Amino acid sequence: MKRWLPLAMGMVACGPAAAPPVPDSAARLTLEPQTTITTALLQAVSAPSARVVWVSGHAATVLRSRDGGQTWEPVNVPGAAVDSLQFRDVQAFDARTAYLLSAGPGPLSRIYKTADGGRSWERQFTNTDSTAFYDCFAFWDMRRGVAFSDAVRGRMMVRITEDGGSTWPLVPAAALPPAQPGEGAFAASGTCVVTLDQRHAWIGTGAADTARVLRTADGGRTWSASVVPVPGGGTKGLAAVAFRDTLHGTALGGDVADPKSRMDNVAITEDGGRTWQRATTQTFSGAVYGAVVIPGRPGWLVAVGPRGLDYSKDDGRSWTNLDTLAYWSVGFGSKDVGWAVGPRGRITRIVVSR
């Protein structure tokens, strides 16, 4: 969603709902600020391992570390600086292979791919609809991915690739629920869409009367929508979705235009996103911009926003604050190491230890 992000700052697997995970009280999270080499606003992070991490953001900024954050390399995308592209999402598979999504109106929404560590890039997709604005994307594997745009003329805009990004055809309108007036996503962190296994994906929406989660269980061929009990309208809705398995997920957001606001902006599901219930609001005020499940730690997730960084050990039912600095996105490369990024080139390493 281009309008409200401040620059300064299908069948689902069925079964009985599991009890909330038992928190590991001995484990703790610590933050390690990194030495930065940019002052750009960083809005996305992808860590395919504990040692390899890619981050991206405004002013065509892309950085990569191959040594767990000890050093960072700038990565040049030819022509991106001329258009001052905002790389608001990144997905990396290793130190060599990564995809970038630039967000913006019309042709400023693009998808790029590198297979040689950023030495060269292929522009795979350029948006040709002046009213579309691509917010986020995610991949099931190196060949199959999904990208989401704000709705256009009353229809949802979901694209699927099955050939490594060479083509991105639109999902037919008949396979998608109708869009609400104004419905889209908040392109804050690259976490408004999440994929799981080889078939499941979820997309969080906002800026319409009601916040919703779109879900697919067949690799993006068909989609359904569920209302989420998070305030909607204008600058409100969902900015992030996070799932630890095909049943248990968390949807987070709020009012992205009011950093002092407090509202019911966290919801949980135990049936794959068919139904949602309100959960405990995170500790920091304002909206959650990004969230991620910590892999290998059931029920653990980290949520970030312009007013702080929280973590939960019980799927969002309770929260612990770790920082009050501004962050826009968060990602984990293992059960022990993650990364949060934000304004003025901020990169912070998150370490889970006993």
Give the ranges of each region predicted by the language model.
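Positively charged n-region of N-terminal signal peptides that target proteins for export
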Residues: 1-3
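Sec-dependent N-terminal signal peptides
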Residues: 7-9
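C-terminal motif of bacterial Sec signal peptides marking the signal peptidase cleavage site
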Residues: 12-13
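Residue-level hotspots at or immediately adjacent to binding/recognition sites across diverse folds
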Residues: 16-354
